[in-house]
């Protein structure tokens, strides 16, 4: 969202009240009329089926993940247009900027990361700051810059040599070093897949190659520590549920995609992703994953995992975060073997770390109310501005607005140039 250094006293509160009132009315209307949750433009049978699903719920239980009965995969917040949904958040940020005298204070929430991790930072820069004795908690990765003055073949040869030295073997996950929302993320299972990926990757930019961790469980753990506090805490734990279908032993994969209310909404995307296998009949009870991405835009959904936060998990994440220089706010995206192991602070691998731009994933739980969603978001940004103000007082200088917008423009332009996600 566009950002400004100026806030008009009193205006944010009045506008916030107006927007909140409108959203509250929409929430009450949707609560009274369950059928209205279906996306506009769908046929009547589909609308009725989705309404029944919302009322009844269906249980999701993937390997390693806690079981969860869901009524829909889309939260009320997720149904709002982004411009409308984030307007109250922007107004809240303007109020915080007025109070703390600086709109770009989040850019110094993590002083050793470019822009505090708010825009345009290197993904690898986070992982590199985790000390060597804690690297066992990190998925092995390397960063490679595709030289603009080298041929595709020479870039591929150099990257393969780097992979060999790092001990990384296929399958691997390829992703841009600068990016967001899963753009450009693909599974590369063979050297041929890697060659095709690099052919479509912009030269002069950096790519990350990471060992593929074949665990179904994935979570986003948002961590917060004030600069003057000796210990941090887990602000949010949200589970990612990847788009998938469960075989019944009779239906083809294509039919399962078309009839499952959780996948039919993005059936065209899912069918394209598994095109060679659409006619296959998965055995009864077999889970077929439809995307590598744990992103809402790929059909994934998130649900609240706050009840699974334990002192042991908090201590482990705090140990890692405190060893990262001047790291105060960010989300650890992890794959885990089982929820029991995660609760013990064991059996997980860090795939990515996100900085100041990270959101609490549990706010996108389909059962989350708009009131609670905004409460969490407002609290999150309050902490972010407080941390930024404290670090500014310690001598760290926030980025200028023009420089921030330049980073925003660069990242947005890169997203359009990356290979298609897988």
Annotate each PLM feature:
Residues 112, 122-274, 310-314:
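Active-site nucleotide/adenylate-binding loops and adjacent lid/helix of ATP-dependent enzymes
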Residues 3, 13, 28-35, 42-44, ...:
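C-terminal active-site "lid" helix and adjoining low-complexity regulatory extension at the edge
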Residues 1-136, 144-157:
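ATP-binding N-terminal substructure of ATP-dependent carboxylate-amine bond-forming enzymes
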Residues 143-144, 334, 355:
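Hydrophobic/anchoring residues in structured secondary elements
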